[in-house]
Amino acid sequence: MTFLLDDEQREFGRTLDRMLGAADIAGAVRAWAVDDTGPGRKVWQRLADLGVFALAVPEEHAGSGFLPVELAVAFVELGRHGVPGPVVETVAAAALLRRLGDPAPSARWLPGIAAGGHLVSYADTYGETDDTGGTDATGGDAGGGRGPYALDAHTADTTFVVAGDRLLRATGHGPVQPSLDPARRLARPAYGGEVLASGPAVRAASRHAVDVAAFLTAAQALGAGRRLLADTVTYVRQRKQFGVAVGSFQAVRHRLADALVALEFAQPLVFGAAVALAAETGADEQRGRGVAAEGAGRAAAVRREVAAAKVAAGEAAYGAARAALQLHGAIGYTDELDLSLWIRKARALRTAWGTPSECRARVLDGQDIFY
């Protein structure tokens, strides 16, 4: 696919790059990992001031509409700079509320999301329901939950859970668990919660939200991979062995070239998924909200596009992380070196919102594996 951003979209990306480059994102990530979200929330507010979160919020709720291409531009930069927090989940929750079309929860949360003042964690049971008579809608238990994990549930302002055909606001969470990325901590939403909506429309909106989450994770991974590659190129130009820069060795060049090719192949898939999401959203709005055969077929095609982008970008970023670690040596995974933050993030993003095997199954077999 040949895809060119317009001047306004490119300038938007450059503006985000400059703003995030001037901020101490690495410091914010390290603070977030020990539950000090203050520096990270300041970054979130600056992102909101530039309109990032408004890109998923309808105009009637102080947003810009749903603009997947601009979201891809933004999330590549968020991944490049390693912005902490549930950025994917917050935007996916906004997409869920927008697609659901229920005015009450939309008015309650969307303006705050657009303004950057409301962090949302989001978990989805992918159509599974509790088999004990519905007493535990989240798949959890009274002791703290055993359903799907929610990223940063302990620091988010709100945690949404889709369980079967119900959308709930969780009342709490279970024990906080570490992950490969110290700034991405996980917890299972607690038993019960406020029911915000129910019915087939919830499942349809949830499918869309999960697609958006996978798509944004792919964009983040692409940005993280590019950062890892750029930092490694800089390093091998500086490090010397036998009196010459190690970057002059053919084996090193080939390793970096492989990483670059993978990232270059992933980029059109990410933006292709953005175009597909934009087209699907426009068609959905033209025919009105609801379940229709044509809409279901279009949505399935979009999910395959998103899955292709997710597996390509996730594997490319992971490959860049492996190359970065190999060429930096043992210093690459030390906590003191910022590179380790991106290495760990790339590994976590690889499996977030769809593992490589799940995404490949969807692309190759057309399997709707999440639902």
Residues covered by each model-derived region:
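Amphipathic alpha-helical regulatory segments at dimerization interfaces
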Residues: A22, R46, L96-R99, W109-G112
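N-terminal glycine-rich flavin-associated loop
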Residues: G85-P103
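Alpha-helix C-terminal capping segments
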Residues: A23, E77-L78, L97, T159-V162, ...
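FAD-binding core of flavoproteins
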Residues: A104-A230, T234
